[in-house]
Amino acid sequence: MPVVHCSSNLPITPYIYERLVYFIKASSISSCISDNLLLVNKTFNDGGCPPHINFCNDEIINPTAGQTVVELVLNAKKGELGSGYLAVDHGKKVVILAFRGSTTRQDWFSDFEIYPVNYSPLCVKEYRKLIEEGKIRECEGCKMHRGFLRFTETLGMDVFKKMESILESFPEYRIVVTGHSLGAALASLAGIELKIRGFDPLVLTFATPKIFNSEMKQWVDELFETDAIEKESILKDEIQFRKGYFRVVHTGDYIPMVPPFYHPAGLEMFINKVGLPQNAEDIEYRGKNNRLTLKDGFREGMSGLVEDWLHVYEHRAYFIDVVGCSGL
């Protein structure tokens, strides 16, 4: 596959394209949690995830399926938010924390609780220590989407303890936190908590709704060193993709454009082709240059219930058709 240069003159390399496709598939299988089809302490191709999913059992499609172990499954209880799973791909030397998109009634309810509330991290002790040591500044005036902040109320410490245990055994492994739509918003918040606890994850989200006010957007970009990663990428003419906060957005998908009074953080990659398949030449690296507007996301003649709008083709078509616990 040739290296494709974007309008920003930064290339979408075969490595980056492969990573994007791999992690949207890893994100998508989180939908199988609803049917209790992800099993702990098993590899993907040995019952860890459903055999009807090619990504789980076909080593041509996923060569490291037999080396990827499901370590923890987060199944949100009634009234809670945040189903997902933690897995380790020993072939790629990566720890994956993936969150499920909107599935339950509570998920839908949280999607629409859009009024802003004051941000407060889960890891308050670690947060205060970083401020006292001068490593980060306090997130003054920071507000975010109420529905998604509910996640910090239900995200248990089990995830962090398990991750610490894994990285003690495999200190050279990288962390990737990922999700689609609601799962992308939760991945963003989990990534912030991991940074506060001293980890250095790559947060890679797909179809992320806007969740931060302007003050928090700036603070999140500082936390993830967005400016430094952007500058280094331009200097080296190569996207630095081992850590930081990256958002993948699809043309015609209006979810990343709402709510209009919030702001996106991180570095953007834009899929400019509507239909599948989408290849490297269909991806534009935009970085911090967010050019999306709300009107760009709506098609003429679009009608129906809001829940129908959230499942339009453009919102699902991110290298694969992201819809339920499907074949991938």
From Swiss-Prot:
Catalytic activity field: a triacylglycerol + H2O = a diacylglycerol + a fatty acid + H(+)
- Could you tell me which InterPro entries the record lists for this protein? AB_hydrolase_fold, AB_hydrolase_lip/est, Fungal_lipase-type
Q: What function is annotated for this protein?
A: Lipases catalyze the hydrolysis of the ester bond of tri-, di- and monoglycerides of long-chain fatty acids into fatty acids and glycerol.
* Top-level lineage group: Eukaryota
Which family, according to UniProt?
Belongs to the AB hydrolase superfamily. Lipase family.
Any idea which UniProt keywords this protein has? Hydrolase, Lipid degradation, Lipid metabolism
- Check the record and name the Pfam families matching this protein: Lipase_3 (PF01764)
Could you tell me one molecular function GO term of this UniProt entry?
Answer: triacylglycerol lipase activity
Span-the-membrane segments of this chain are: none
Write the Enzyme Commission number(s) for this entry.
3.1.1.3
Gene name for this UniProt entry: LIH1
Name this polypeptide is given: Putative lipase LIH1
> Mind listing the GO biological process terms from this record?
lipid catabolic process
The family database entries (PROSITE patterns) matched by this protein are listed as: LIPASE_SER
Indicate the residues that form the catalytic site.
Answer: S181 (nucleophile), D253 (charge relay system), H315 (charge relay system)
